[in-house]
Amino acid sequence: MDATLRALNRFGLGARQGERQRIRDSRSWLRGQLDGGAPTIAAPAGVTPESIGDALRAVRMAGQGDEQQRRDARRRVVEMGASEVHNTLSVRATTDRPFVERLVAFWSNHLCVSTGAKVLVAPLAGSYERDVIRPHVLGRFEDMVLASAKHPAMLFYLDNFQSVGPSSRGAQAGQRGNGQRRGLNENYARELLELHTLGVNGGYTQQDVQELAKILTGWTVNGIGGQAARAMRSAQPRRRARGSA
C-alpha cells in the first residue's frame, strides 16, 4: 500500500474516486487538513430549534393521548433523527477534509448521546454534533466537554436536567406526588469522570461523584430544546470535587 492510500485510510475516510491521484504528497495533504477551523454544516431542511421543540412537546403531550397519537408523535421524532443521519453521511461522503470528519466522528463517539435510549434525545443528536463537537474539534478539550454538559441532548440523555440539590429551594418546592422531594441525580457526574475525562481508574471516589453532581445541579432545559441554569435547583453551598471548585 502506498503512502497516499495509507494516509487516506488511516487518517481519512478512505479514498474517493480520483482523490488518490490528486494528492501528490501525503504529509502535506495531512497538514493541510488542519488548516482553518472545522467545516460548518447546515441542519437538514425543516429541522430548526422550533421544529425540534414542537416535536418533543408533541411526544410529551401524546403520553396522555391514545396509541395513534403516540405513534404519530414518535414517528415525527424518528423522521427528524433519520434526516440528521442522512445529512451527516452526505457530508462525510463528499467532504474535502476527511481527517476533520474522522475527528468529529471520534469525539462524537467519546462524548456520545444515544439516540435509541430516550426518545427526547433522537432529534437533538444532530444539533449536538453540529453545535458541540464540530466547533471544538480542533480546539480545547475542556471547551468541548463544557459545551457537551450544557447541551439539551446530554442533559436529557444522562438525566442532569432533573437533578436537584437535596436542600435547594427547588427540591423543597417540587415535591413528588408521594411527598418525597426530587433529589440529586449522579448519572452524568459519574459518566463525566469515568468515561469522558479521568477514566475508570482515575482515582476518584464516590464522594467525588456526589460532589460533582451537586456542582452540576441547576443545569437543566428551558422548556424543551434550550439549555438553562436555575439557581433554585442548585446545591448550596458551592461544592468542591477533587480539590477544585
Describe each PLM feature range:
Residues M1-A3, T94-F99, G183, G203-Q206:
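Structural motif
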Residues L5-Q21:
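Flexible, low-complexity segments enriched for small/polar residues
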Residues G12-L13, A38, L111, T115, ...:
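Short alpha-helix boundary/capping elements
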Residues Q17-H136, F161, S167-R176:
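N-terminal accessory alpha/beta regions
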Residues V121-A245:
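Active-site substrate-binding loop specific to GH73 endo-beta-N-acetylglucosaminidase modules
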